[in-house]
Amino acid sequence: MTITNDIRYAGVNDHQVDLFEGQYTVPNGMAYNSYVILDEKIAVMDTVDQHFQHEWLDNLAVILGGRKPDYLVVQHMEPDHSANIASFLNAYPEAAVVANAKTFAMIDQFFGPGLCENKVVVKDGESLSLGKHTLTFVFAPMVHWPEVMVTYDSTDKVLFSADGFGKFGALDVEEEWDCEARRYYIGIVGKYGAQVQALLKKAAALDIAIICPLHGPALKDNLAHYINLYDIWSSYRAESEGVMIAYTSVYGHTKAAAELLNDKLNELGCKKVVLCDLARCDMAEAVEDAFRYGKLVLATTTYNADIFPFMRTFIEHLTERNYQNRTVGFIENGAWAPMAAKVMRAMLEKSKDITYLPTTVTIKSALKSASVAQVEQMAKELM
């Protein structure tokens, strides 16, 4: 695959992985991206997952056409990108590894000391000339590991963005970018919005024509769309108008309340309502929707003087990713001492700029006229 006249794609598609990072379902697989810059000196940008050593080295050999690379640039040390550093150096022992000091420390941790005999330690803002192409290294700590840096090629105006602007899905599957990029961002990078904002500010000073991430397609058209979404996500603003109703239910009574609220909102003309059974939906997609929409209703039962486990897990996913700037409402159920709303609100106590609905729906075992009226009032408050 040709990115520009001098930049080639050397990555691989993985359709064997079932859970990315041990937790995210990837029905359309994953791409582990690597790039080669062909110039007077040749730079290889990152490696790939350990299971694709031979395929990746074969890809490199075809692109190199008998030449040998001068540099391996390591932007990110997560093993799906760094696992083949040793195999690369075994194949091309004269190549120098280009990375920052934190990256070299991690290389020692993963591979043991002494792997990189020929190395170029770069600092933030430093450049490396390949001949026609000049690479500038921009540090991006905690996007989403501390050693991360991105690389800007000023000749072809390409930003090699590490995990930034990545998405789930292999490159041989055609699918819309936004949803799987959103799920990827919220799940993996979402905690570090401030750090992403800092990187976006640095990137704004660059003349970028192409973004080459470590997962997902190279982005060439309408870059403003992708950058705008990253700005929204990393500033914790709602992307779309709508209400998400996330519920857990033991015997169906809390589910009935959630479905009633869904119906009432639709009757009132709510632009978008997403109803999610947390025991059965994909948790990462549920978290994605909570961040996508501006309003969230949490409905669950009191369980062991706490809340139902799937709801607790869901809220923990939200808070560890700095959930904020949203409107939240509660529906609680309890046969003798309903306290779920109190527990859920306490879990969100440290979340910034949360507006709570005036009405909390309290169900004692099953919906009755009083709790139905509360649901109807909550629907009005959400409009």
What role is predicted for each listed range?
Residues 40, 51-98:
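Active-site metal-binding motif and surrounding structural segment of the metallo-beta-lactamase
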Residues 144, 148, 164-191, 234-239:
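Active-site-proximal loop/helix segment associated with metal-binding centers of metalloenzymes
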Residues 2-5, 99-148, 192-198:
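Metallo-beta-lactamase
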Residues 84, 282-286:
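Short acidic active-site motifs
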Residues 171-211, 215-218, 260-276, 286-383:
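FMN-binding flavodoxin-like domain, especially the glycine-rich phosphate-binding loop
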Residues 212-239, 313:
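Short N-terminal or domain-adjacent regulatory/targeting segments
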Residues 45-47, 69-77, 97-100, 159-163, ...:
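Active-site neighborhood of phospho(di)ester-bond hydrolases with catalytic His/Asp-centered motifs
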Residues 2-60, 150-153, 157-161, 254:
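Conserved beta-strand hairpin/beta-sheet module of binuclear metal-dependent hydrolase folds
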